[in-house]
């Protein structure tokens, strides 16, 4: 450990979930399956949106960006976590820790803004259909995306810089499975009040404001839906809105629970369980909740599979001709 006014360990050690090897192997297999499904589902959605002309609209443009963020957010955490399940020494360098913290926080904050943009897009389409092309023009969509990535990167960089200016002259054992801000603040032997206040302020602003936008948008949508005379149209829209609201509530609930509580009441074991859901599990379910229940996406997927099947059939026929 470096001895100076600014003290930083040469490495951080993760406690992880358990030291019992059979359970670690089981968790490795479970999370490997979850990560694989996350990658396949989100990559497939991105491909569908980009190759299908019927999906070239703002809603699916935001969905493809959400899928990219889910892939990125999960990739920032899961590969290292999987490696640590099978490693005897679950360590990470300070630079690796800083990078992991930066990328995860960037993608998580950007995802909050993308979810808000998606809710606003649905509000514009259902509540103001005549103004939809103006409210959700290509320029507006690009501005939403740029704002999401820029604000996510900026706030994340601030957190990382302030966190790694602290001294860690005590233990270097992180009771977590990745480098997150609260457990590192708990390890510091210097005053972390500024860090805690800034974490609370930025998280309150980004997470609370975007959640309010989402809630108001869906509330207006539901009010509009109540005026629909067709019971079938009402039930379909209610079903879609309900699934989206449940997913958003769970995602934001986990984030608010993690980052808007004081360090003094920080429960390491409880927060690890909560963190698993928003870092590993939610990215797997987002494509199902937001996309694959959608008729347009199902049709696009069906056409893609038919195209692949036709290509394979054509290739096999060519092989038969050559063999003859």
Curated annotation (Swiss-Prot):
The keyword Transit peptide does not apply. One of its GO terms (cellular component) is plasma membrane. The keyword Magnesium does not apply. The chain crosses the membrane at residues 26-46, 55-75, 100-120, 134-154, 197-217, 238-258, 272-292. It comes from the Eukaryota. Residues 47-54, 121-133, 218-237, 293-324 are cytoplasmic. Residues 1-25, 76-99, 155-196, 259-271 are extracellular. It is a multi-pass membrane protein. Glycans are attached at residue 5. It is found in: Cell membrane. Coiled coil: none annotated. Disulfide bonds join 97-189. PROSITE patterns: G_PROTEIN_RECEP_F1_1, G_PROTEIN_RECEP_F1_2. Pfam families: 7tm_4. Keywords: Cell membrane, Disulfide bond, G-protein coupled receptor, Glycoprotein, Membrane, Olfaction, Receptor, Sensory transduction, Transducer, Transmembrane, Transmembrane helix. GO terms for molecular function: G protein-coupled receptor activity; odorant binding; olfactory receptor activity. PANTHER family: OLFACTORY RECEPTOR. Odorant receptor. This is Olfactory receptor 5AS1. The gene is OR5AS1.
């Amino acid at each position: 450990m470096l001895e100076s006014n600014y003290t930083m360990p040469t490495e951080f050690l993760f406690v992880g979930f358990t030291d019992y090897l059979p359970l670690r192997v089981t968790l490795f297999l479970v999370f490997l399956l979850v990560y694989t499904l996350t990658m396949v589902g989100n990559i497939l959605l991105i491909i569908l949106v980009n190759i299908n002309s019927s999906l070239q609209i703002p809603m699916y443009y935001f969905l493809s960006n959400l899928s990219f963020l889910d892939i990125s957010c999960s990739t920032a955490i899961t590969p290292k976590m999987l490696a640590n399940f099978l490693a005897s020494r679950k360590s990470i360098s300070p630079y690796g820790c800083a990078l992991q913290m930066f990328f995860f926080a960037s993608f998580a904050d950007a995802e909050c803004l993308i979810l808000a943009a998606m809710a606003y897009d649905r509000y514009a389409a259902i509540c103001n259909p005549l103004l939809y092309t103006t409210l959700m023009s290509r320029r507006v969509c690009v501005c939403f995306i740029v704002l999401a990535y820029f604000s996510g990167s900026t706030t994340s960089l601030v957190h990382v810089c302030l966190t790694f200016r602290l001294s860690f002259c005590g233990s270097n054992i992180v009771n977590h499975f990745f480098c997150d801000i609260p457990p590192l603040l708990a390890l510091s032997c210097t005053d972390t009040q500024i860090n805690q206040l800034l974490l609370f302020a930025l998280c309150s602003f980004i997470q609370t404001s975007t959640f309010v936008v989402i809630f108001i948008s869906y509330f207006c949508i539901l009010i509009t839906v109540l005026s629909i005379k067709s019971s079938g149209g009402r039930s379909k829209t209610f079903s879609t809105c309900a699934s989206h609201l449940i997913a958003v509530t769970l995602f934001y609930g986990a984030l608010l629970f993690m980052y808007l509580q004081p360090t003094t009441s920080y429960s390491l074991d409880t927060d690890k369980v909560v963190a698993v859901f928003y870092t590993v599990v939610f990215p797997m379910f987002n494509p199902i909740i937001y996309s694959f229940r959608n008729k347009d996406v199902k049709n696009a997927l069906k056409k893609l599979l038919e195209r692949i099947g036709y290509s394979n059939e054509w290739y096999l026929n060519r092989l038969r001709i050559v063999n003859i």
